[in-house]
Amino acid sequence: MKILITGAAGFIGSQLAHRLWKNGDVLVLIDNFSFGHEDNLTFEDHDFRKEVIRMDIRDKDGIKSLMEKGDVDYIYNIAGIAPLPDCQLNPTEAIDVNLNGLVNLLENGRRYGVKKVIQASTNAMYENETEFPTREDDFKVPTLIYPNTKYCAERFAQSYCDTYGMSVTCLRFANVYGPHVDCLRKQPPFVAYMVRELYYGRTPVFHSNGEQRRDYIYVDDLIDLAIAVRESKGFDAVNVSSNTNYSVNEMYQLAEDIMGKHIKAEYADDAHYWERYPELYEGSYPIKKEILNHEINKYSLCDNAYAQKKYGWQPKVSMREGLSRLIEAEVELLKNVKA
């Protein structure tokens, strides 16, 4: 079985590649390294660094060259621009990568007989929901650029299924955590950020009171479902959630306990949440304070009953166990990174 993984040098893509390699699948790995890191490609039992092709998913000739032999069975499209402020700052780039990149894969998949495309989507599309837990069919159109790119990508995926009879499953990830989560980027995911600050002995700054709640999913549990959906036909959209959530304060206290470090966090004004992106606060129409307030303080909890019923999937990794694994891997990485 031959599988193309895009975004293979990223957090999720690299972990997926490692699992499928251990399963004996033949892999074609691509990444343009805009967010991926070579460090993600080394595992105790295998080094993928020389196997990853430096390629953008928008590269029409490049993608065609990988697929025109007709021997790629499945595509996992994990590539994309995910950080919310990056998408707000460069919306045309976000749309081009997250939407046009997928369409490039779908079109080549259509032409060259791919059995299935599994698309990385997001539960950020539920940002305007008010009833929880959120099911796949509970939906209000999102506000921010990133979830809108994923919403539109799902519509194009469904169009290809309805028009050509292709099969695409969109996995709506909750907040994914685990080894290789990117702690080095400009605006790291919360879990990676708090571990990094604790490791360096710095005071973490939370732009809230710490009581907002998010649902999380451990990367290995996500991969279990990504494999389970591979044989389903037609279009599908599936929540990938642990069916529970945690507050910022609960997560931070757990990280303190695991790392044996205790640093009092600072709670700051949510208006400065994206202060590392000053351009968003400039111009005739700066970003609205209420939008930042909503993004920071929103409540998220997705219902995973559909994934359990249709695919027999159940998340297995507890938050303590998963966070411990993440901390172990991140600390090892940070030993070689200047503070």
What are these model-derived regions, one by one?
Residues M1-V176, R230, K298-Y299, A329, ...:
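N-terminal Rossmann-like NAD(P)+-binding domain of SDR-like oxidoreductases, especially those catalyzing
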Residues F11, L144, R172, P189, ...:
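Amphipathic alpha-helical recognition patches that constitute DNA-binding helices
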Residues D61, D73, P85, T92, ...:
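Residues in well-ordered alpha-helical elements
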Residues I95, T143-E154, R185-A192, D215-Y216, ...:
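Short-chain dehydrogenase/reductase
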Residues Y146, Y177-D182, Q212-R213, S242:
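Short histidine/acidic/glycine/proline-rich micro-motifs that form metal-
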Residues Y199-R202, F206-A339:
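C-terminal substrate-binding subdomain of Rossmann-fold SDR/epimerase-dehydratase oxidoreductases
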